[in-house]
Amino acid sequence: MTAEGLLQILLYLGLLAAVTPLLGRYMARVFEGERTLPGIVLGPLERGLYRIAGIDPAREQHWTGYTLALLSFNLLGLLLLYALLRFQALLPLNPAELGPVGPDLAFNTAVSFTTNTNWQSYGGETTLSYLSQMLGLTVQNFVSAATGIAVAVALIRGFARRAGKTVGNFWADLVRATLYVLLPLAFLGALVLVWQGVPQNFDAYVTATTLEGGNQVLAQGPAASQIAIKQLGSNGGGFFNVNSAHPYENPTALTNLLESFYLLMIAAALIYSFGRMVGDTRQGRALWTAVFILFVAGLAVTWWAEAQGNPAVTALGVETTDGNMEGKEVRYGTALSALWAVATTAASNGSVNAMHDSFMPLGGMVPMLNMMLGEVIYGGVGAGLYGLLVFVILAVFIAGLMVGRTPEYLGKKIEAREIKLAVIAVLVFPLGILGGAALTTVVPQMLASVQDPGPHGLSEILYAYTSATGNNGSAFAGFGANTPWHNTGLGLAMLLGRFAVIVPTLAIAGSLVAKRAAPAGPGTLPTHGTLFITLLIATILIVGGLTFFPALALGPIAEHLSLTAGTLFGAVP
């Protein structure tokens, strides 16, 4: 752990804290229908889109109508992307003449990008045409992120409105999130990436001669435009196989800062937007502080674990003063690799600038735990906020039980219906993660994908189904996921982790929006102070994390203890 690494991390955290209120205020204005500067240019385009689609943005929807519109839109997007992947060999912009994507892989990929997961059981430059990357994946990067923002905004309205019947208009929220938030920021990010050397072309692949005299194929393509939105929209799927560890995706220190900052920017700002939209910025600051504490704690553990190096390597007499550098870019080192790993799993992003499978056991456990907690530590674009508010509901319920009062939040009584729906949303994660991992260990065809023995093999299984259920998309690379069994199983886990959380969340919004707000009384728990922040952190860790402790004890914790004791596990025969 070096002073240079600490300064880099402090710069990142300072930028995040500085931009949060600025972007948060802007997004609150966008979704409250107020005038904004980009609206001068984009307003006519927005109104034109409504006219073409026959949408009246002022006609709001009941939560059931909002949910039906969302599910229909995402189903259509999934089917169109599946068809595009299956028929890409017949379509233009395929200079490498890549064939059609197989049915199980096409299903997995279509589900992955529709659910904002971006799990990739393939290498982008060897599997997908330029058209598939642009028209298929990049489009879904925008609309899946906009879908998450729309759900978060609908839930905010549930808390903010009084005795209402509607939670907004899904189509209007989708368009505004795309036009006013995602598109401008992605455009600016893409310009910076092109400036720094990221490819943005339609050229054929280039064959180059290496210093040893051999040939190497250099992939090309419209990468910058996809990379910008995959970072910004908490998508994460790389244009190239090794994601942002590839020098074409992440060539300089500036691109590394920009891409890692884009990981959390919108998710952090949406928490501030929540405070603005409910009329009490203290509420947003309290939630932001809680997740900031969890984020910094996880980052500290990960960086410490990686900076210590591998004791098995040290025992061989190898110099390890730079820490555990296996699977890492030398230009970024342990500090920036740990920062990215924690940020990408705190958000539901999943992009990487280092290989998580090569992290030390505890260093790899923190990213896994971030996802197991429901990715509410800032979380994905929109998804992080509505997941966090589900835990807020559980926290005030627990507080109400302790003092013997009906729980309430922002004046809205939290009753049996909201608690049941919140519990359903929380139970999705252990069902998908532990259920998928258990199935993998007992089905021989699925277990064959595990390439490492012992505790690390279990960690690879856990990480895969945690990433899929949490809609993250990162992976421990020792897990061979491109099989019909896992393409199907992981695809189902992604669908479960996305829509089995969204539906109860929107139901909570519909229930809350109909309630009147009661004034705070002498027994009301203040939800903007230190006590509530502590209670919320405890709820996230205990309710969200304790379920997974036995699995973590058998995986990364057991691996850490074995490694410390000098016990190693051989390769799978």
From Swiss-Prot:
Would you name any one GO CC term?
Answer: plasma membrane
Q: Which domain of life is it from?
A: Bacteria
Residue stretches in coiled coil: none
Per UniProt, the keywords (alphabetical) are: Cell inner membrane, Cell membrane, Ion transport, Membrane, Potassium, Potassium transport, Transmembrane, Transmembrane helix, Transport
What's a single GO MF annotation on this record?
Answer: potassium ion binding
User: Does the keyword field hold Kinase?
Assistant: no
Which parts of the chain span the membrane according to its record? 3-23, 65-85, 136-156, 179-199, 254-274, 286-306, 383-403, 423-443, 489-509, 531-551
Q: How does it sit in the membrane?
A: Multi-pass membrane protein
- Compartment(s) of residence: Cell inner membrane
Role of this protein:
Part of the high-affinity ATP-driven potassium transport (or Kdp) system, which catalyzes the hydrolysis of ATP coupled with the electrogenic transport of potassium into the cytoplasm. This subunit binds the periplasmic potassium ions and delivers the ions to the membrane domain of KdpB through an intramembrane tunnel.
Q: Could you describe the subunit structure of this protein?
A: The system is composed of three essential subunits: KdpA, KdpB and KdpC.
Q: Which family does it belong to?
A: Belongs to the KdpA family.
Official protein name in the record: Potassium-transporting ATPase potassium-binding subunit
Species name: Rhodospirillum centenum (strain ATCC 51521 / SW)
Q: Which gene encodes it?
A: kdpA
